[in-house]
Amino acid sequence: LNQSDPHLIKENHAMHTPHLNRRHWLAAAGAASLMPSAWAQNYPDRPVKIIVGFAPAGPSDIMGRWLAQRLSERTGKSFVVENMAGAGGNIGMGAAAKAQPNGHTLLLASSTYVVNPSLYKSVPYDPLKDFAPISMVGESPHVFFVHPSVKVQSLRQLTDLVRSQPGKFSYVSAGSGTVAHLSVEQLKISLGLDMTHIPFKGAGPAVQSVVSGEIAIGCTTLPAVKELVRGGLLRALAVTSAQRFASSPQIPTVVEAGFADQESSTWQSLMAPAGTPAAVISFLQREVVAILGAPGAREQLVELGFN
């Protein structure tokens, strides 16, 4: 028999293919439409990893752990932070971009997410295509600070000191391309200061280098230095906001110091790899909104140093 004979093909198809009427197609379409929501009801079915592209004790790490704890409490499932530091956050962002888009790997991104493509020759992610945004979760101003042995009490005194001794001083940041790094570079250019940048893999180790006295000057976000300033291990000279920060009112602003053009902040945002099911994105959005709107959440974040 010639199995390719069109008459045989038509006859076999009629014998073995069930008749599907309009009701069958509507039922099938309805079942398919329920699949994403049913799948989301079981999400997450294993621990969820939140990648932070910087070392522990920096703002992204602090926010990531705060958020992970509350997501775990609300869902009864495990959300954990994994620090993947280096290259101004590029290592972590690249790893998150390549992760399976199933909702079990997320990214706690910061301002470097949009800055780095303009600073580096190449980055391991496409900021427009590789991620699906879930929610903005926080924002924090920066702080200019020094080791207590540096005999200055204000940002103006610090810039005068650096100008008087060109090339002598270095300053630290959480990494090249961070907003704090760019803020200091802007200050250097506007005042003609000669000062060397020492980048670290995160605010935590950068701050510790100043606490130890290894480096004299630093600039990073408020959450990374807040308690160290309160404890007298660092001296804060100015916060880069228009008004004094509610939980650190003793720190003057850059506006008060005469540097109004130095206002800046770093944001944190939760993201998922592109292609993550829409039902999972919606679920996470609802959970994050509920967490941020919960009684006492705003006060907790302000105390940590976030807006």
Predicted regions and their residues:
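Short, Lys/Arg-enriched N-terminal segments with co-localized hydrophobic residues
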Residues: 1-14
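N-terminal secretory signal peptides and thylakoid transit peptides that target proteins
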Residues: 15-32
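N-terminal signal peptide c-region/cleavage motif recognized by signal peptidases
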Residues: 35-37
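N-terminal (or domain-start) structured segment
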Residues: 39-128, 168, 176, 193-216
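Short coil/turn segments
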Residues: 55-57, 111-112, 139, 147-152, ...
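Hinge/capping helix and adjacent helix->loop/strand transition within the periplasmic-binding protein
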Residues: 98-103, 118-205, 254, 267-300
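A ligand-binding cleft/hinge motif common to bilobed small-molecule-binding domains
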Residues: 113-122, 188-190, 217-251
